[in-house]
């Protein structure tokens, strides 16, 4: 089952420490990262590009910008450690870059939770060709 989860995340193109990011999103929102955010709006999941469609999509846009600031680690392949204590994500990494990557993922998971009321099903499987030119970070 764990292998299927990792393969599914790879197929939708979610970046970062895939397993950790997916778990954070589930813990914070109660939603499955793949089915709920894998192709949401213009910026969530694979093919992310374009003006955010709503606050939920903006969370993903800001997340991509956060990743662009990482310098000494690879957000597509490197993994980090975190824990879930008292309903809070705790980034436990000693490596500064991996800690920052964890903080990027933590921030998007919290942002998605804080914007659950903006989640719009019409953007769930949004066609990326409809997206307008992206703004810069």
From Swiss-Prot:
Expression sites by tissue: Expressed by the venom gland.
Extent of the signal sequence: 1-16
GO molecular function, one term: calcium ion binding
InterPro entries given in the database record: PLipase_A2, PLipase_A2_Asp_AS, PLipase_A2_dom, PLipase_A2_dom_sf, PLipase_A2_His_AS
GO biological process: arachidonate secretion; lipid catabolic process; negative regulation of T cell proliferation; phospholipid metabolic process
UniProt keyword list: Disulfide bond, Heparin-binding, Myotoxin, Secreted, Signal, Toxin
Disulfide bonds: 42-131, 44-60, 59-111, 65-137, 66-104, 73-97, 91-102
Regulation: Heparin and wedelolactone inhibit the myotoxic activity. The PLA2 inhibitor, para-bromophenacyl bromide (BPB), inhibits the myotoxic activity.
Record Pfam families: Phospholip_A2_1
Protein origin, superkingdom: Eukaryota
Important for membrane-damaging activities in eukaryotes and bacteria: annotated segments: 121-133
A cellular-component GO term for this protein: extracellular region
Coiled-coil intervals: none
Places the protein is found: Secreted
Function: Snake venom phospholipase A2 homolog that lacks enzymatic activity. Has myotoxic activities. A model of myotoxic mechanism has been proposed: an apo Lys49-PLA2 is activated by the entrance of a hydrophobic molecule (e.g. fatty acid) at the hydrophobic channel of the protein leading to a reorientation of a monomer.
PANTHER family for this protein: PHOSPHOLIPASE A2 FAMILY MEMBER, PHOSPHOLIPASE A2, MEMBRANE ASSOCIATED
Family to which the UniProt record says this protein belongs: Belongs to the phospholipase A2 family. Group II subfamily. K49 sub-subfamily.
Quaternary organization: Binds to heparin.
Protein name per the record: Basic phospholipase A2 homolog MT1
